């Protein structure tokens, strides 16, 4: 099978997503109702989001392809960073030297670096360097992501889940705007 490349970042191939399913007899098969290649959503004219999957309930209803129908609807109108009561699986391509704005969402985000080195910077000034295979558990904190390379794209995969509002010393923190992604909202659609 030929390697499918992104025109804007030839070092990163276009990611594929393979969905398993059941045939009429209950045998495990691959679902072919949605193309495998993940389309890219350009964010703020810069970085790219690839929506790999999304659900709107927990537990997820897998009967009669309910979850696949839900996900399919999000391909034309991508969700926000997280979906209330559901989950979002997203691959994020960060341009060379790219940096998000400082932001907070009412979510828990599991992020794994797939390519490159990415800084996770907190509003306290603390930061960590994430290398390929490293995991960040982002728990509703005010943070930004930065690609350390000025010549190569970075890639991360995220699973985001809604979280309860954070309360510190009797004060609700809430979500913070300033995602730096004009075409993406923190929650929902």
Swiss-Prot record:
<dbReference type="InterPro" id="IPR013096">
    <property type="entry name" value="Cupin_2"/>
</dbReference>
<dbReference type="Pfam" id="PF07883">
    <property type="entry name" value="Cupin_2"/>
</dbReference>
<comment type="function">
    <text>Part of the gene cluster that mediates the biosynthesis of the phomopsins, a group of hexapeptide mycotoxins which infects lupins and causes lupinosis disease in livestock. The role of phomC within the phomopsins biosynthesis pathway has still to be determined. The pathway starts with the processing of the precursor phomA by several endopeptidases including kexin proteases as well as the cluster-specific S41 family peptidase phomP1 and the oligopeptidase phomG to produce 10 identical copies of the hexapeptide Tyr-Val-Ile-Pro-Ile-Asp.</text>
</comment>
<protein>
    <recommendedName>
        <fullName>Phomopsin biosynthesis cluster protein D</fullName>
    </recommendedName>
</protein>
<dbReference type="InterPro" id="IPR047142">
    <property type="entry name" value="OryJ/VirC-like"/>
</dbReference>
<comment type="similarity">
    <text>Belongs to the oryJ family.</text>
</comment>
<dbReference type="InterPro" id="IPR014710">
    <property type="entry name" value="RmlC-like_jellyroll"/>
</dbReference>
<keyword id="KW-0843">Virulence</keyword>
<dbReference type="InterPro" id="IPR011051">
    <property type="entry name" value="RmlC_Cupin_sf"/>
</dbReference>
């Amino acid at each position: 099978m030929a390697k499918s490349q992104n025109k804007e970042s030839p070092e990163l191939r276009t990611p594929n997503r393979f969905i398993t399913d059941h045939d009429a007899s209950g045998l495990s098969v691959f679902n072919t109702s949605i193309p495998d290649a993940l389309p890219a959503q350009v964010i703020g004219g810069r970085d790219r989001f690839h929506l790999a999957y999304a659900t709107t309930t927990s537990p997820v209803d897998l009967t009669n392809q309910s979850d696949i129908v839900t996900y399919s609807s999000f391909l034309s109108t991508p969700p926000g960073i997280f979906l209330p009561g559901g989950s979002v699986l997203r691959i994020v391509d960060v341009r060379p030297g790219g940096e998000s704005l400082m932001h907070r969402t009412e979510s828990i985000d599991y992020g794994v670096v797939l390519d490159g080195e990415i800084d996770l910077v907190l509003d306290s000034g603390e930061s960590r360097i994430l290398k390929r295979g490293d995991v960040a558990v982002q728990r509703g904190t005010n943070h930004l992501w930065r690609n350390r390379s000025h010549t190569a794209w970075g890639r991360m995969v995220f699973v985001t889940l809604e979280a309860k509002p954070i309360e510190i010393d009797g004060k609700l923190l809430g979500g913070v705007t300033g995602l730096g992604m004009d075409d993406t909202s923190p929650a929902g659609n």
